[in-house]
């Protein structure tokens, strides 16, 4: 595919992410472009907007890559949005989904064709389907796990029915509809021909029976089958229209089949799919899916034809200059991420691309990837850890263990969760991987006697021991030291944990993982292992272990480490300096559509690490009071502990939102209840507990007293302002998630996808745009300080793009004094200096609550109140020489040793620009 370079790239000051759906369309987005331009962002960052499944709320369930989503307004509305962006001088970044498609009946023409024609479909190679699985019953067949009960019961209950539309035939099961293979219709149509006496219908039936078999996949047979079936289908439709008696005879035969379970069973047995009970998906699904969602089937974008078919519209938008950048969703699901990104880079002329890549704490983004960086979770977690007190975090962990009785260390929780996911939700993926390994072992006399059960057991252990999401080996290419190290660490971990496993088999698997054995089957195994490993990590850690182990949930974020004890300012500086050197245009974020808690919620919860004793006293008292609201001891103490953290982080919150969040958390934890095996008794007890607790006026009084006594709201706001400043000044391109430009106390989706009141934000911005810090601080309850800060810093970024560009660097500034550990200070290119507080509980001691008190909080942070417990206590920052102007307050400061108190006198953070 020829390169289509991104046209006239605009300086990337900041992106603003919006979630598009039927309730927020292209035209709705166009209506807020003026506000976003006034705010100072440079790019609108859109969720996927190719045609998605009907009613999609997110766009990741694409059904047609050839057009824009009709529910968003289609091409016309998109052109209006594009014109409005151009008028405002804004660019556009688009989220794309190369890994999978939604299986939404007729809406996905490719999948419909696969169901109709099996391996002989023109699109069979578009999807990652195993046409020769270990289960012989599924040979050349796609499992369709859509039934609410066992197949035979559903069939005999009359819930399956053949339907005719013109010359096409389908089977309907409630809202599900699947096509009948044209070749399977010959007997039914032959009987109808006999009934009606139609020789022409008899000829059509015979011709359908002579169509090339679905097993034939040579190009000539595929072309013949496709051409002939369409001709015959069209003639059949004409015949039914021209001769009512023929149509009546066909419909009578359809009715007869529907009334005879044996006849219908025989017809369904001739299809290229197997209708099945939905529970079979976990163990028998024969196509790769997005995690455990069987309605999202994996695509083979490693195939150039598939890449071109899925990216044609996207690359047209890039070539036209409509789209200035791309965010690649779930890059770890692909068979060959490097190859895909190379092809995408070539097709976009080395355009701006970031990837949704979840990095482990000690993992680096592959330097060979032609991308600007990640979508920002690595930055998010550095900031979250920075705002956690290490000593307090250790105490919180001990408190959590005492409260819940949970004695397992986090690595053990992860290991157990990953094994459970592989036994249950992703058993089909493990089974397919086991089959590949068994085939490989058959070719080695020292390995061939290992049974499938043994191999399955070993594979589960190796995947569970993998410390990163996946490796990136590429057949025929050198294996990187990082991939060798990750594979070796996993194998060593299994050897320690399971000495009963054959050591020679472990060595053999370790060699396979790094392409140490030649052969296509061996290479296929290594590639498939990486894809399975990624899915298991995501489902086992993010969506299971994170909901089981939760001492301090500000750390339980995508890519985070719940067992972390925080990060020092020095560690943060090292990470940012490395980012400036290697990924200076990576995306930065604090909140996304996928975060489990917003940045503001995490800012509050992180404060608990500074209050471990007070926190333990509070939850002990709350638990005693609320014991009476439980039913038979349910919910368990882990859920109760999570509820209390959630209330601290998101207060005020009503029982509906809190209950929905706790319910989702319990289902994800998969201990007492789950999505696939819900326990109504536990679910009801949990919901009733949340409702009763929040209706208990005495408890609410205790909770609000705790929040007020420790100034959680005010201190959380100060921490949020510090984190937001880092977002807007550290190396990279900051992204603001919709609505988070003011205080946002959202939880995991769907809570974080609620409608945004843009009119209120527009009015507030208009009132504060030209105001000083005191006016902004006085609007604290409305989110004024955060909005004002973002506006000021984005305006500065737009006026001085070079100061934040790829060559702008990052240099820590020395901080000295008793409170040095509470300050983070650095420069960018020597022309911008940033000073923000961290661990603010030890600094802000005099706040009493309310909007006006946030203004006093700024003075308290600066050491301006005599009643502070030390305040900044003479803490100094060594500024480079010269005169500096505060971008936020307009105040002037001379370089050299400057007191933090002086810099933060009027606002909780300082951003200084060196005067020319």
Question: What would you call each of these model-derived segments?
Answer:
Residues 1-54, 66-71, 79, 83-87, ...:
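Carbohydrate-interacting/catalytic domains
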Residues 56-64, 100-130, 368-377, 753:
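Aromatic- and acidic-residue-enriched segments that line the glycan-binding/catalytic groove
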Residues 75-93, 101, 105, 112, ...:
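Conserved, well-structured beta-alpha core segment at the onset of a catalytic domain
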Residues 467:
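Active-site microenvironment for binding and transforming phosphate-containing groups
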């Amino acid at each position: 595919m020829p390169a289509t370079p991104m046209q006239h790239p605009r300086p990337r000051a900041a992106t603003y992410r919006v979630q598009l759906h039927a309730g927020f369309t292209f035209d709705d987005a166009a209506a807020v472009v003026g506000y976003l331009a006034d705010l100072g962002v440079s790019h609108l960052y859109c969720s996927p907007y190719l045609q998605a499944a009907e009613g999609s709320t997110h766009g990741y369930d694409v059904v047609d890559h050839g057009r824009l989503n009709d529910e968003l307004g289609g091409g016309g509305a998109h052109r209006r949005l594009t014109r409005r962006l151009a008028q405002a001088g804004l660019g556009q970044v688009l989220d794309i989904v190369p890994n999978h498609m939604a299986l939404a009946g007729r809406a996905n023409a490719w999948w419909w064709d696969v169901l109709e024609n099996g391996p002989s479909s023109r699109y069979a190679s578009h999807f990652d389907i195993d046409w020769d699985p270990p289960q012989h019953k599924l040979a050349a067949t796609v499992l369709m796990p859509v039934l609410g009960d066992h197949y035979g019961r559903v069939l005999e209950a009359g819930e399956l029915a053949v339907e005719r539309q013109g010359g096409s035939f389908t089977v309907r099961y409630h809202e599900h509809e699947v096509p009948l293979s044209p070749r399977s219709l010959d007997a039914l149509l032959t009987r109808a021909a006999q009934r009606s006496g139609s020789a022409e219908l008899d000829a059509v039936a015979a011709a359908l029976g002579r169509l090339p078999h679905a097993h034939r996949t040579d190009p000539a047979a595929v072309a013949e089958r496709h051409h002939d079936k369409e001709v015959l289908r069209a003639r059949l439709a004409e015949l039914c229209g021209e001769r009512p008696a023929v149509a009546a005879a066909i419909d009578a035969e359809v009715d007869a089949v529907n009334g005879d379970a044996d006849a219908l069973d025989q017809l369904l047995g001739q299809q290229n799919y197997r209708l099945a009970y939905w529970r079979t998906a976990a163990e028998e699904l024969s196509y790769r899916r997005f995690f455990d969602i069987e309605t999202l089937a994996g695509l083979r974008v490693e195939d150039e034809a598939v890449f071109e078919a899925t990216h044609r519209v996207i690359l047209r938008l890039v070539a036209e200059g409509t789209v200035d950048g791309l965010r690649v969703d779930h890059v770890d699901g692909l068979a060959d991420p490097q190859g895909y990104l190379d092809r995408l880079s070539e097709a976009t002329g080395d355009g701006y691309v970031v990837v949704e890549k979840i990095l482990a704490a000690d993992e680096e983004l592959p330097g060979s990837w032609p991308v600007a960086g990640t979508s920002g979770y690595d930055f998010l977690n550095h900031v979250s850890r920075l705002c956690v007190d290490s000593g307090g975090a250790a105490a919180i962990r001990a408190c959590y263990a005492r409260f819940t009785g949970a004695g397992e260390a986090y690595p053990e929780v992860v290991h157990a969760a990953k094994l459970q996911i592989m036994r249950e939700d992703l058993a089909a993926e493990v089974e397919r991987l086991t089959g590949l390994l068994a085939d490989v072992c058959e070719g080695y006399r020292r390995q061939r006697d290992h049974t499938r059960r043994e191999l399955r057991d070993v594979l589960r252990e190796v995947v569970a021991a993998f410390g990163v999401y996946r490796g990136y080996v590429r057949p025929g290419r050198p294996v990187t030291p990082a991939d060798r190290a990750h594979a070796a660490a996993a194998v060593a971990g299994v050897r320690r944990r399971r000495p009963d496993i054959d050591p020679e088999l472990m060595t053999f698997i370790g060699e396979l993982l790094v392409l140490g054995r030649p052969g296509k089957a061996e290479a296929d195994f290594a590639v498939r292992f990486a894809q399975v490993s990624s899915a298991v990590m995501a489902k086992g850690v993010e969506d299971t272990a994170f909901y089981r182990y939760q001492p301090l949930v500000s750390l339980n974020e995508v890519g985070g480490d719940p067992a972390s004890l925080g990060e020092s300012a020095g560690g943060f500086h090292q990470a940012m300096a490395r980012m400036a050197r290697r990924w200076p245009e990576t995306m930065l974020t604090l909140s996304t559509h996928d975060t489990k808690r917003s940045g503001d919620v995490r800012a509050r919860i992180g404060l608990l690490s500074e209050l471990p004793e007070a926190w333990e006293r509070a939850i002990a008292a709350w638990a005693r009071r609320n014991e009476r609201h439980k039913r038979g001891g349910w919910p368990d103490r882990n859920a109760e502990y999570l509820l209390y953290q959630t209330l601290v982080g998101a207060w005020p919150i009503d029982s509906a939102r809190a209950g929905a969040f706790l319910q989702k958390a319990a289902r994800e934890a998969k201990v007492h209840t789950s999505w696939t095996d819900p326990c109504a008794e536990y679910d009801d007890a949990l919901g009733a507990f949340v409702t009763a607790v929040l209706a208990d006026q005495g408890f609410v009084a205790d909770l609000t007293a705790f929040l007020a006594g420790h100034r959680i709201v005010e201190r959380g706001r100060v921490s949020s302002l510090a984190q937001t400043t880092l977002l807007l000044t550290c190396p990279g391109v900051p992204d603001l998630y919709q609505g988070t430009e003011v205080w946002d106390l959202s939880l995991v989706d769907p809570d974080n996808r609620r409608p945004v009141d843009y009119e209120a934000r527009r009015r507030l911005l208009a009132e504060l745009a030209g105001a000083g810090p005191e006016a902004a601080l006085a609007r604290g309850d409305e989110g004024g300080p955060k909005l004002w800060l973002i506006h000021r810093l984005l305006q500065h970024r737009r006026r001085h793009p070079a100061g934040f560009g790829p060559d702008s660097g990052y240099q820590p500034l020395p901080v000295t004094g008793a409170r040095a550990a509470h300050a983070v200070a650095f420069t960018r290119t020597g022309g911008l200096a940033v000073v923000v507080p961290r661990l603010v509980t030890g600094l802000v001691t005099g706040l009493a609550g309310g909007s006006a008190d946030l203004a006093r909080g700024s003075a308290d942070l600066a050491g301006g109140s005599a009643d502070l417990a030390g305040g900044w206590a003479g803490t100094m920052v060594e500024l480079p020489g010269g005169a500096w102007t505060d971008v936020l307050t307009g105040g002037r400061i001379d370089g050299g040793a400057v007191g933090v108190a002086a810099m933060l006198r009027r606002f909780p953070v300082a951003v200084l620009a060196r005067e020319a």
